[in-house]
């Protein structure tokens, strides 16, 4: 009798739009389609890292219940429209951008003055309509985060949020807009009781649907790894002793991270040649590296996070035998 579980594979990725895709995976043992599909869906909706406006300062406005002369939208609707702008930051965790426009016409996300390491994914998104003589001057703080953070959490927790005229927004950081899944029947040879998992994913364009699935799977693996490391159980005692397996990504050189030349050279100067060497260093240790500043550190952290890794991780039996230095 077969006791090993079938291992599924992705058999199709169908693009349904620029940021919309359907991913089909099979075969799963019976029941595993719902088990894994629901887990992935929950992680996709709650745990993806993204970017969102968190604070807004509008010239001439003291609170969100104000109106502006020459602007069709009131401040509440203006804030709702600003929350619909999709930002993406590169190698930084926050930035403040400016929106200035005057004269009759439509104000869109493309009118926002951006820093070199910030971009707007939906520049055609409408923010406001100005009439003759209308003027808009807005400062927008954009931050990196995860999930949903109500504005009142920061409003009462940060002194900067108490400044008169600064409006704190509820922030939805998740780059995933919609996720659904369906479980269908699958067949392998004579077995007809297997599952096929079909996932439908739509993002806001900050990440692709395929990358969203990869990141959610890494999060699940990381969270479940603690259970695999349980000690003192009967199963562990009976298991044959063998050297722990090392994630292949840790054996890859830091050059594969495609860091800037400055960051890569700083790491090599500290004898950090492999990704496994890098993740064991803490932020404080890296900041002590000559010529490696906060900007380079943020770049390294972001690149590692995109692969489900962080600084300060602990590895047993590192470096493995036979690893060239």
UniProtKB/Swiss-Prot annotation:
Keywords per UniProt: DNA-directed RNA polymerase, Nucleotidyltransferase, Transcription, Transferase
GO BP terms in the entry: DNA-templated transcription
Renumbered residue ranges of the record's region Alpha C-terminal domain (alpha-CTD): 246-325
Cited InterPro entries: DNA-dir_RNA_pol_insert, DNA-dir_RNA_pol_RpoA/D/Rpb3, DNA-dir_RpoA, RBP11-like, RNAP_asu_C, RNApol_insert_sf
Molecular function (Gene Ontology), one example: protein dimerization activity
Description of how the protein assembles with itself and partners: Homodimer. The RNAP catalytic core consists of 2 alpha, 1 beta, 1 beta' and 1 omega subunit. When a sigma factor is associated with the core the holoenzyme is formed, which can initiate transcription.
Protein name per UniProt: DNA-directed RNA polymerase subunit alpha
Gene source species: Paraburkholderia xenovorans (strain LB400)
């Amino acid at each position: 009798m077969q006791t090993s579980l079938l291992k599924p594979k992705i058999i199709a990725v169908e693009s349904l739009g620029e940021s919309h895709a359907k991913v089909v995976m099979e075969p799963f043992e019976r029941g595993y389609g719902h088990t894994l599909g629901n887990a992935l869906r929950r992680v996709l909706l709650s745990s993806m890292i993204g970017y969102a406006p968190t604070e807004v300062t509008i010239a001439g406005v003291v609170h969100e219940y104000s109106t502006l002369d020459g602007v069709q939208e009131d401040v509440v609707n203006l804030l709702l429209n600003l929350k619909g702008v999709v930002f993406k930051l590169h190698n930084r965790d926050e930035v403040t951008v400016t929106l200035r426009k005057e004269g009759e016409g439509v104000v869109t996300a493309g009118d926002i003055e951006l820093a070199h390491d910030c971009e707007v994914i939906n520049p055609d998104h409408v923010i406001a309509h100005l009439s003759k003589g209308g003027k808009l001057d807005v400062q927008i703080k954009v931050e990196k985060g995860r999930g949903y953070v109500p504005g009142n959490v920061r409003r009462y927790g940060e002194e900067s949020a108490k400044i008169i005229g600064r409006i704190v927004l509820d922030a939805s950081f998740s780059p995933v807009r919609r996720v659904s899944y369906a479980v269908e029947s699958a067949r392998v040879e004579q077995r007809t009781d297997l599952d096929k998992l079909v996932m439908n994913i739509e993002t806001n364009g900050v990440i692709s649907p395929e990358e969203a699935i990869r990141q959610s799977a890494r999060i699940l693996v990381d969270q479940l790894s603690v259970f695999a490391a349980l000690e003192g159980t009967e199963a562990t005692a009976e298991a044959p002793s063998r050297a722990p397996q090392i994630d292949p990504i840790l054996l890859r050189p830091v050059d594969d991270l495609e860091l800037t030349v400055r960051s890569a050279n700083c790491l090599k100067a500290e004898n950090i040649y492999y990704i496994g060497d890098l993740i064991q260093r803490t932020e404080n240790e890296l900041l002590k590296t000559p010529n490696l500043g906060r900007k380079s550190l943020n770049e390294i952290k972001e690149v590692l996070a995109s692969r489900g890794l962080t600084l300060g991780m602990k590895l047993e039996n590192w470096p493995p035998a036979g690893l060239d230095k």
